[in-house]
């Protein structure tokens, strides 16, 4: 689809994911052992054969740049590119003021590509979407803007833009993060919310961005300013994400916002269910990323006991000796000494766990080194004196930490 340009918003600071975002942007946070959060948005474009993509970066972007260079370098192929673009600061020495401002400051790059449609997507959610199906819906409706949406429990909807639609899928109401969200007619416990993914007719987008940039009263945000201004015209439509079908996937779609530590941990636990709602193994929808050249994971018994790996994901380069690993995700080069008991944990890679450690519901960031005999997640009151502990009791060991020495 040569006339389509992708713009991925990847500048999120991710303050609610701290300490995982202390040294990296939210889109570059590791996920599922092998991936980064941004990989899922990129795969949605690439698997739909949409290969002209700008990735707009901002905060702490070095890790993200490195990942894109190593794993997503398709430049050199005619008319195909995935290019990261740092904050342009074209309107002064400041960061992007909102999602619309981020796109506006890169207007020149878009105009040079001469697209017919522009797809603007976020980069910090876990889901699979065939974007071509959304584009087809957009074209059939002759829309100037199409917003993708999904049903959300009403109690959670205030964190999103809440949408009202008519029988034809036309947007007839929109409120950004309302305190009292409106429910779907006939479904009092659910609301229809924006996923933050947009398909614009290019010339409409360019015009709206210029007009919005000149408005000093605007917050320069799609949800707060652009969409409320556009939908009363009657040519803004809503694409129902639940109708998106991918070969080899379950009929019930999966979408997770992993903006908090608890949500991030739960999304990993979803991967480990017997009948996982989100699969990493669909050959018809491969999940591309950067895979470092590492040997296979190794599991060996020790004098302290046999190795047990139960309902877990273990990445290449990992070495587990005589320990028990249950419902956990071990990233690249996780080194687990003997007699450890690790349950419901996420190790982000290059982690050393000493002999006899006990870990329960712990996220261990990269390059951490935990001394032999250390217990984490067993006594939360004690853990709170040393580490970040989430509302639901998930302990986070920060990047590069030395614990118990």
From Swiss-Prot:
E.C. number(s) listed in UniProt: 2.7.7.27
GO biological process: glycogen biosynthetic process
Record-linked Pfam families: Hexapep_GlmU (PF24894), NTP_transferase (PF00483)
Keywords associated with the record: ATP-binding, Carbohydrate metabolism, Glycogen biosynthesis, Glycogen metabolism, Nucleotide-binding, Nucleotidyltransferase, Transferase
Signal peptide location: none
Positions contributing to alpha-D-glucose 1-phosphate binding: 96, 161, 176-177, 194
PANTHER family documented for this protein: GLUCOSE-1-PHOSPHATE ADENYLYLTRANSFERASE, GLUCOSE-1-PHOSPHATE ADENYLYLTRANSFERASE-RELATED
Subunit structure: Homotetramer.
HAMAP family assigned: GlgC (MF_00624)
Role of this protein: Involved in the biosynthesis of ADP-glucose, a building block required for the elongation reactions to produce glycogen. Catalyzes the reaction between ATP and alpha-D-glucose 1-phosphate (G1P) to produce pyrophosphate and ADP-Glc.
Protein name: Glucose-1-phosphate adenylyltransferase 1
Chain's gene name: glgC1
